[in-house]
Amino acid sequence: MNAASTHKAEARTIWLLSAYHTGSHAAWAGGYARHSRHNVQLLTLDGRFWKWRMQGGARALAAEAVARLDAPGAQPHDVLPAAILATDMVNLPAWLGLMRRRLPAATPVLLYMHENQLTYPWPAGERRDLTYAMINWQSMLAADAVAFNSAFHLESWFAEAPRLLKHFPDYNHLADVAAVRRRAFVLPAAIDTPSPASSRAIGAPDATSTPPLILWNQRWEYDKRPDRFFALLDRLDAAGTPFRL
């Protein structure tokens, strides 16, 4: 067997559940599907009404999954996923419950945390609804592994989770935090870097210049603090420090 056939034989079908499929979530999912050696199939919902996606999106995603399994001519060994990859906007326990009659019980499940509803900066004047943080938490309990997109994200979640769970009078899951932490890890979101010709330095004469490249790969929203980013750029510029952007 040659290397190409071995590589092909190892490929598996993965269902990627994306309940809020827009912006960075869609870019990440699409990039993974394009570059993975596996057959990554996207099951998605439009990126709007985020609260409703977390509350009711599991039903629509389950219906899409069942439609794939029941498609004319579909054979179970061809269409059943070898693994499930779900984003944080998916109510994972609800989806797994709805799919319990259709998926093998041992199907591995990975939860990918783009963000969470416990430490996510809340708009000024609005009160945080802990319902959605609990959906995140129970999804972590249901997953075999939990990936966070940064070390800061992971550490801030596990620093705050015990304070969330202490709100509840009994059976408060505090004993589960350590177990979930042990199966959590950091998996940064990949990016498509620009070509040298399209990433000419600000203040640099040509593509052979070597100032450091500063990359902003976040949404242009209040919670990402673009004001601080620009303040830093202003300081670098005022100091005469060369950089590329």
Where are these regions (language model features)?
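Donor nucleotide-sugar binding/catalytic pocket of nucleotide-sugar-dependent glycosyltransferases
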Residues: 142-203
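N-terminal subdomain of nucleotide-sugar transferases
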Residues: 1-49, 53-72, 77-83
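Conserved donor-binding/catalytic core segment of Leloir-type glycosyltransferases
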Residues: 191-192, 205-224, 230-237
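Short hydrophobic "strand-cap" motifs at the C-terminus of beta-strands
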Residues: 17, 149, 187, 214-218
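Active-site proximal beta-strand in glycosyltransferases
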Residues: 102-121, 136-148
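Short N-terminal targeting/anchoring amphipathic segment
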Residues: 12-15, 66-98, 105, 110-112, ...
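Nucleotide-sugar donor phosphate/pyrophosphate-binding loop at the beta->alpha transition
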Residues: 119-138, 162-172
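Charged active-site motifs of nucleotide-sugar-dependent glycosyltransferases
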Residues: 11-14, 209-214, 243-244
